[in-house]
């Protein structure tokens, strides 16, 4: 995009705009096909009204990642594992969460190698081991982008773990006991070390982790194992760092939350009304923090 539009900010906004449109269509399809007919538009509404939705419009990676990840999921649903692998590879090239997506796709390949949108459970013939192996081998193509990135980092820095070390140095992210992580995050959210705006952001982080854990539990109870794996890995990675950081942004990538909310609102209208009444003012606050140069997650 920068080749066509020389201004970096405008290029980033255009990429987010196009990718966001693709992601919105794909999310609507997943909600309609995998969750409940008639919930597609509502799921998209809840995504774009979420607390961290500002980052979908800004020149960040969330919209582009979702465009690749959601279309990869739709391809896997049809049993097109090559397309799913290529799209998941694109997601992996953009964010490390693409590896979590790949793990979820691997679980889906083991359970329904022919795809789960081609027939009902009763109509679908039993999967053969060869089908599962073929699907899993095909998905390995998604590892090519992160593998090349690791090779690039090794050649550039001489360190295979350069990315992890940069995360630790720049963002204080390293594997930490989740109990210690929770305590540190709680202190940051409700202590007196930071200013009120920073406290507010950390309070959102705590709520976001709670929402993520609840989503994992609900998905596991409903035996949606691929989505459970993806959500659990995403939340687990952020809940075992030094403190909770950028979790509301990570929730943007968890389509089961938005699809699940849409289903809940279809059953009980007050659920959606309450969500929007709380989320929209928070989203506006986050946008204002970002545009005034404050930390916004």
Language model segments and positions:
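Loop-to-helix entry region of an early transmembrane alpha helix in multi-pass inner-membrane enzymes
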Residues: 5-22, 198-205
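Transmembrane-helix motifs of polytopic, lipid-linked glycan transferases
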Residues: 14-34, 214-216
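Specific aromatic-rich, kink-prone transmembrane helix
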Residues: 26, 46-49, 64-83, 106, ...
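Transmembrane-helix signature of polytopic, membrane-embedded enzymes
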Residues: 27-49, 83, 225-229
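Short acidic/glycine- and proline-prone juxtamembrane loop motifs at membrane-interface regions
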Residues: 58-64, 247
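Membrane-interface alpha helices of multi-pass inner-membrane proteins
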Residues: 69-74, 82-108, 141-145, 235-238
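Membrane-lumen/periplasm interface segments of specific transmembrane helices
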Residues: 102-212, 226-231
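Signature aromatic-anchored transmembrane alpha helix within multi-pass, membrane-resident enzymes
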Residues: 139-143, 267-296
């Amino acid at each position: 995009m920068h080749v066509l539009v020389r201004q970096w900010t405008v290029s980033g906004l255009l990429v987010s705009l196009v990718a966001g449109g693709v992601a919105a269509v794909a999310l609507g399809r997943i909600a309609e096909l995998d969750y409940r007919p008639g919930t597609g538009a509502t799921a998209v509404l809840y995504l774009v009204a979420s607390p961290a939705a500002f980052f979908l419009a800004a020149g960040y990676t969330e919209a582009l990642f979702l465009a690749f990840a959601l279309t990869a999921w739709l391809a896997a649903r049809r049993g097109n594992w090559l397309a799913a692998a290529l799209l998941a590879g694109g997601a992996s090239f953009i964010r490390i969460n693409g590896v979590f997506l790949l793990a979820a796709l691997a679980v889906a390949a083991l359970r329904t190698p022919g795809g789960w949108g081609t027939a009902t459970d009763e109509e679908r013939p039993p999967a053969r081991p060869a089908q599962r192996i073929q699907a899993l081998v095909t998905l390995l193509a998604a590892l090519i982008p992160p593998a090349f990135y690791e090779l690039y980092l090794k050649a550039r820095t001489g360190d295979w773990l350069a990315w992890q070390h940069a995360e630790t140095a720049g963002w204080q992210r390293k594997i930490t006991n989740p109990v210690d992580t929770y305590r540190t995050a709680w202190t940051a959210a409700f202590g007196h070390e930071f200013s009120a705006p920073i406290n507010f952001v950390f309070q959102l982080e705590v709520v976001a982790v709670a929402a993520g854990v609840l989503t994992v539990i609900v998905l596991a109870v409903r035996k949606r194992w691929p989505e459970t794996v993806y959500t659990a890995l995403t939340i687990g990675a952020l809940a075992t760092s030094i403190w909770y950081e950028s979790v509301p942004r990570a929730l943007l990538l968890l389509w089961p939350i938005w699809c699940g909310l849409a289903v809940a609102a279809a059953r009980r209208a007050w659920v959606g009304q309450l969500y929007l009444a709380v989320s929209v003012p928070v989203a506006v606050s986050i946008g204002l923090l970002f545009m005034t140069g404050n930390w916004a997650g």
